[in-house]
From Swiss-Prot:
Its main location: cytoplasm. Signal peptide: none annotated. It comes from Polynucleobacter necessarius subsp. necessarius (strain STIR1). One of its GO terms (biological process) is leucyl-tRNA aminoacylation. GO terms for molecular function: aminoacyl-tRNA deacylase activity; ATP binding; leucine-tRNA ligase activity. It holds the Pfam family tRNA-synt_1_2. GO terms for cellular component: cytosol. It catalyses: tRNA(Leu) + L-leucine + ATP = L-leucyl-tRNA(Leu) + AMP + diphosphate. This is Leucine--tRNA ligase.
Amino acid sequence: MSKDYDYRSIEAAAQADWEGAQVYQVAENAVDAQGKKKSKYYACSMLPYPSGKLHMGHVRNYTINDVMARQLRMQGYNVLMPMGWDAFGMPAENAAIQNKVPPAKWTYDNIAYMKKQMAAMGLAIDWSREVATCNPDYYRWNQWLFLKMLEKGIAYRKTQVVNWDPIDQTVLANEQVIDGRGWRSGALVEKREIPGYYFNITAYAEPLLSGLDGLGWPERVKTMQQNWIGKSRGVRFAFKHEIADDYGNFIQDGLLYVFTTRADTIMGVTFCAVAAEHPLATKAAANNSALAAFIEKCKTGSVIEADLATQEKEGMFTGLYVTHPLTYEPVPVWVGNYVLMSYGDGAVMGVPAHDERDFAFALKYELPIKQVIALKDESPMFNATCWEDWYAQKDGVVCFNSAQFDGLSHEEAVSAVAKALEKLGIGDIKTSFRLRDWGISRQRYWGTPIPIIHCGDESNPGCGAVPVPEADLPVVLPEDCVPDGSGNPLNKRADFLSVKCPKCGKPARRETDTMDTFVDSSWYFMRYTGPNAKTMVDERNEYWMPMDQYIGGIEHAILHLLYARFWTKIMRDLNLITFDEPFQNLLTQGMVLNETYYSEDASGKKTWLNPLDVELDLDEKGRPKGAKLIGDTLNTPVVVGGVEKMSKSKNNGVDPQALIDEYGADTARLFVMFAAPPEQQLEWSGAGVDGASRFLRRVWMYFSGQASALRDASDSLPSNLNDAEKELRREVHTILKQANFDYQRRQYNTVVSAAMKMLNILEPIKLDQNAAISAPVLRECLSILLRVLYPVVPHLTHVLWKEVGYAKTMGPLLDAPWPTVDEATLVQTEITLMLQINGKLRGDIKVPADANKEQVEALALQSEPAQKALNGGAPKKVIVVPGRLVNIVA
């Protein structure tokens, strides 16, 4: 056995063994050697977008999953660790436009390369279950379930105001609008009314909220979903009016509805604000060119609540009035740029005295501000020129200047106002949710075609929107399209567009919108269980699901996880599955960070520099005091920008392939597991990578030196162990017990620490004729080290396991039994305590493990250092710290 740690040949040999035996392909209902059914464990990382190359975030995510899967397999679980590709979406189209190739080719080429990278990492993936969401065999089931949802009324078509990117010619999700601009094009986003398909996720708001309670998810993620769903209880009521349309009918039956959680402030209403698209706004703008222009301005910008909360509040009076339901006073109606038609009724009541947004609006437009709640102690006083936080308080306040509601607390007033409005027939208590229905239509090519055929046109309605018959699924996306950036290329494909109406047989036109890619990622984890199933899912899904452990970034806390939970409940209601939640446990790994460096030109424009191209100038304490570009003869000033998330934009990423080529996959895996606990941020360190590599070389060299003696050693321990052997086993099994605990709580950084401690203990031991430790004892201890280290460092440990001969007696390492802690060996009959004289360490003493304070004192006083210090006299005091030390004050 070579003493050189040749990671290339070691990793190639291990991977050849695994691939040749197809060791990662798992089957349902697997049994152990005794024929007993194994418990299943489904551990899955969020599937990646095939962007072309893995980044270090991928490496960390998949290594966490792999460590978990390997360790649980050794514990006897039937473990599923699959992988797939979230293959549809805009990046492929953008790359296709840039490279003038079909998105399909770009995507499949990237998948092939990234699979090679994953293989190089040594991941225990069952590739027989691979799924690519751009494959018609996969997305046909998106289409099939869409049709089922259409039948049940869960999917529906409507026209709604959306974010429209005029450059990319597509609808943008709220999350794709940044500071009012399209995330990719940078164009000012417009508000447009566009017909599209929606999923009625709001009908599931309550179960989506209550279902969080039983999940083993981080509280932070649960809170984010709770806030996104946004349950609130309040009063929905109407302001009456007599504003008629062109036909003489009262608009919306003469009722302007609003929803409020602060019905106790109803007597302070001094205006109402409506969305730019509200029927009252449209009515008022018909004869008001200034208002019409303002409404058009409102249609540019985001439809996101968060953006609206921070943008400048603007409004314009419509000239219309509605009637206050309790005071019967006229209330002016304004158009506000902060009111969304898609939220609630598209109108809000304005109470400037007790809502900070309304307060600012009223000051700007000189609207009345009427105080209607006051602190119980009436101090401090209300000031209509300056906002104070207590104005919006619910606790410790009472109604004031509110007629029959004066003196009532918040809760009392809400109840009383609700009853008064209910008695008038224009209001009631209502539960409202912030959650909006999920719009899935995208004016994009590279996505799942929506299975709808349009029959007729404006002059001849025909059959309208007709679902594609199930027998005609999938509606296959032509994969040879090359987008040019001028909108959806499907609109130019007659071979895709032209079709006969399934109802009447007349010429018709396919829907060219495709589904939001979140549809693809909402159920892929179920398709892994039966990728070749003739139905959407089959009985294998019931075996593996719900998933035991899901792993992914915190950035997916809301949309992906929420949509996946919704999709699961839909499938349950359609009797496709029996479970209610998809992911029992969730681990959100921290981001990978690295140093950033940049240079600036005369205009202040930054050019971000890769850390590998920068040389640091360190002070005497090793702290950076400056930096320069390597090989730069122009002395370009380099600014140290601090530690930030690895990203293309900051040019501070580390190429995993380059890392594996230079150090090997085991070193990369060891570093990302050791550098930080999984949930915490990981700061990249070249020195840390070097340290991981040195540790693995130490492991290899130590085993290579003992291999020949260990191969012939017995697996049975001697019946009579000497003191050194007992102590060695106690130390190793103590560390094993801690490692087991750390594996259980997913603290893999301290698992690596445990392996390092074991090596430090074992490394000094050499098997020779004078060795105090016998070969069988060392063989047992080293087998524990290899098994503890194996999930993190599978290649090196796999080869050593074979070289030392463990495979002959215990089988391949990946299925070797997880080591059991020998509790008996942990029991100590004797312990060592530090001995101090007058607070200074003077040696140690051995005492019985169960010795009481008096016995410890006696043994300490009998020791040679104590006898010498006391010189026949008595001590002033003896201090015993149980289990640690004895201090004799002479």
